[in-house]
Amino acid sequence: MFEFITDEDERGQVGIGTLIVFIAMVLVAAIAAGVLINTAGYLQSKGSATGEEASAQVSNRINIVSAYGNVNSEKVDYVNLTVRQAAGADNINLTKSTIQWIGPDKATTLTYSSNSPSSLGENFTTESIKGNNADVLVEQSDRIKVIMYASGVSSTLGSGEEVQLTVTTQYGSKTTYWAHVPESLKDKNAVKL
């Protein structure tokens, strides 16, 4: 069963062969461990970045405090939203935000413009209500009015019509608000939406 090797040269060669195989196995294991460690580090950094991005999308939102419309000839020609930061949100720059307008006649995406409200077209503008900035929400106590010209987007909003407004911040978080025009606009200058 076991063979005895009596020649000294043959015994040394078997030992060197075993040593070479052992060293080769150690090298292969070291390379595999290095690849595994690099892959784990890459996945950890990707996971961390994805987590931070998801956290920003969830936490860096705005809250719509109120909405009202200006009435002209028994139609709503301006839609105004009062917005503030959600709890725990970072600074929100409304100039880098978009508003998706899905109304009775048209769906479009509005972008920021510093123009006067009557010349907005498919844009929106902002005015400070409370706070030092007219277009950046810095503190939770800040309030900014977002103004959209309904006639510039599609047409004025009549009695009973509604428009879906989705505000997307620079972080990618979305806040949706349904603005419902009351059934009666007679003898009114402004209405709650």
From Swiss-Prot:
Question: In terms of domain of life, where is this protein from?
Answer: Archaea
Q: Which cysteines are joined by disulfide bonds?
A: none
* Keywords linked to the UniProt accession: Archaeal flagellum, Glycoprotein
Q: Tell me the compartments it is located in.
A: Archaeal flagellum
Keyword Glycoprotein among UniProt keywords = yes
| One Pfam family it belongs to | Arch_flagellin
Q: Which GO terms describe its molecular function?
A: structural molecule activity
| Entry comment on modification after translation | Glycosylated.
One of the GO BP terms on file = archaeal or bacterial-type flagellum-dependent cell motility
Which cellular component, as a GO term, is one annotated location? archaeal-type flagellum
Propeptide positions, renumbered to this chain?
1-12
Its family?
Belongs to the archaeal flagellin family.
Q: What task does this protein carry out?
A: Flagellin is the subunit protein which polymerizes to form the filaments of archaeal flagella.
Protein name in the entry:
Flagellin B3
Organism name: Halobacterium salinarum (strain ATCC 700922 / JCM 11081 / NRC-1)
Which lineage is the organism of this entry classified under, starting from the top rank? Answer: Archaea, Methanobacteriati, Methanobacteriota, Stenosarchaea group, Halobacteria
Gene coding for it? flaB3
